[in-house]
Amino acid sequence: MSQIHPTALISPSATIDETATIGPYCIVGDEVTIGAHTVLHRHVVVTRLTRIGEHNQFYQFSSIGEDPQDLKYAGERTWLEIGDHNTIREACSLHRGTEQDGGLTKIGSHNLLMVNTHVAHDCLIGDHNVLANNVGVAGHVTIGNHIIVGGNSGIHQFCTIDDYSLVGGATLVLKDVAAFTMVSGNPAKAHGLNVEGMRRKGWSKDSIDVLRQAYRVVFRSGLTTVQALEVLKQDLLPKEQKIEFLIDSLQKSRRGVVR
């Protein structure tokens, strides 16, 4: 049987796994699903229409699955989905999607969202990411995998932060962040490769050296994006398949990438 504190308020339409823990003064609303071994420590509110996976930790005063902060929202049935093995620290707010953009906000697995992080409506967040204290993620943002966003940073709506990148603290991101890059500042500017992140993943020196070449081609050579893509595909992709991440970043960007 689920470990539910007697002060918790649980909707009759909520589904809670028998191994989950619901702490003191938590509220679990209508049509909420909570998976195995997930813990709501205390004073956590899961408003409604939210699916939560396994082995997640939610800390006090986090607000999960609240209505989107969008003037177009008119009470439609929209959802928040959260995967497995995430840690959601104190006072985080994660909002559901809007009907205009598919009706879903989605957070993957193995993410750490530190104190007071906000994830707005219709965001898509992948796996193995760290969003530090007071990060604000506006609506319709896509965050890939293995990304660190420094504290007090803001990400403009519709931006994409691509895999293995690093956003420095107190950064204002107004354009897309290409894979592997480090950006910081207000507004954000590119400052090199996330080499330390690559080393922590155990990537070889040879791989990193080829990615350094790719960075110089895209950000320091003076070539147009079209010209840089040709060099990446013809000269560097045969040497290192990870170049595909960078090529994909450049090809799919709608806002232009941070340079």
UniProtKB/Swiss-Prot annotation:
Pathway: Glycolipid biosynthesis; lipid IV(A) biosynthesis; lipid IV(A) from (3R)-3-hydroxytetradecanoyl-[acyl-carrier-protein] and UDP-N-acetyl-alpha-D-glucosamine: step 1/6. It catalyses: a (3R)-hydroxyacyl-[ACP] + UDP-N-acetyl-alpha-D-glucosamine = a UDP-3-O-[(3R)-3-hydroxyacyl]-N-acetyl-alpha-D-glucosamine + holo-[ACP]. GO terms for cellular component: cytoplasm; membrane. One of its GO terms (molecular function) is acyl-[acyl-carrier-protein]-UDP-N-acetylglucosamine O-acyltransferase activity. Pfam families: Acetyltransf_11, Hexapep. It is found in: Cytoplasm. Gene3D superfamilies: Hexapeptide repeat proteins, Udp N-acetylglucosamine O-acyltransferase, C-terminal domain. It is an enzyme of class 2 (transferase). It comes from the Bacteria. Keywords: Acyltransferase, Cytoplasm, Lipid A biosynthesis, Lipid biosynthesis, Lipid metabolism, Repeat, Transferase. Its EC number is 2.3.1.129. PROSITE patterns: HEXAPEP_TRANSFERASES (PS00101). Signal peptide: none annotated. InterPro entries: Acetyltransf_C, Acetyltransf_C_sf, Hexapep, Hexapep_transf_CS, Lipid_A_LpxA, Trimer_LpxA-like_sf. NCBIfam families: lipid_A_lpxA, PRK05289.1. Belongs to the transferase hexapeptide repeat family. LpxA subfamily. Involved in the biosynthesis of lipid A, a phosphorylated glycolipid that anchors the lipopolysaccharide to the outer membrane of the cell. This is Acyl-[acyl-carrier-protein]--UDP-N-acetylglucosamine O-acyltransferase. It comes from Psychrobacter arcticus (strain DSM 17307 / VKM B-2377 / 273-4). The lineage of its organism: Bacteria, Pseudomonadati, Pseudomonadota, Gammaproteobacteria, Moraxellales. The gene is lpxA.
